[in-house]
């Protein structure tokens, strides 16, 4: 079952990449629920109203890790927007009878190379605070 779950996961992301709503609609069970930090177990109709409009802003999904067991998969992926912005998320997907019945998304971070952190220089007033002074030995 694990290999077929992997196939379903890749088909799900491919539907977003190709903006094929018909494929995605065929994958989601009528009882489908979606949760994220912004959504709490919304149903199919709300999912398509809230989430599908962003499909036009996403260019590519690269699955970096996938753990599948039974009818469930947990994945980490990097997504790339149409503007080139990249970010990483994780998702837990649960299938029944080949249909996606539950999806939970956990938002990650921007994966563009970070600018170097600025070098901190202590102000004279900071030296008066013992805890702060320990961070900046003279």
Annotate each language-model stretch with its function.
Residues 17, 40-41:
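A structural signal for short, well-ordered beta-strand elements
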Residues 8, 18-31, 35:
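Short, well-ordered alpha-helical segments enriched in acidic and aromatic residues
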Residues 10-14:
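Amphipathic alpha-helical repeat scaffolds
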